[in-house]
Amino acid sequence: KKRFFLLASVVSVALLAMSCSGAQSASEQRECVVTLSGNAYITASPESEPAYIDEGKCEICNWDDEETVVSFHFRAMDKGKMTVALQAKGHSLVEVSLLGKTEEVELASDILTLVEVGTFKVKEPGYIKVDIRGLKINEGESFGNVQSLVVKGNMGPVVCVGGDFSTHFGRRGPSTHMSYTLPEGDVEW
């Protein structure tokens, strides 16, 4: 009985370890939602009336100037192909740039809708920046709202600040994990 229990325990732990390892075939598709809150920043905006991200409402405020750029960031853990879509609402034409390609995307909905941007090749693992800029407001007073990116593909796991993780720590935490080289010699604090 003890041997059977020990064997069953070892097999159970091994199966659990394999299922948590994230191992996948090269052709397996993954999907990840990269939310505005915690993963996006306003990287360009006019000083007179700057746009900003309202974390609580998960929306872009004052997004009515073509100079404003909203940049999403995430990390692809492997190379491969990925399809990017915007979870967005509004009535406008926006420009989406990533991995050396730029696509124009038409937003035409009063409710959040999934709008495909295109398929992109991830040539190597690493951080990916997605810039979104408004080109033309078709209706209303702003370019609308992009609440998240939906990324699908075989580029391995995607790392970003998750919806259940505090955006406070998501925006501030990464700086505590950067490499720091200790100074040589005596140091006085």
Predicted features by range, described:
Residues 1-9:
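Bacterial N-terminal signal peptides that target proteins for export
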Residues 24-189:
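Extracytoplasmic
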Residues 8-17:
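Bacterial N-terminal signal peptides
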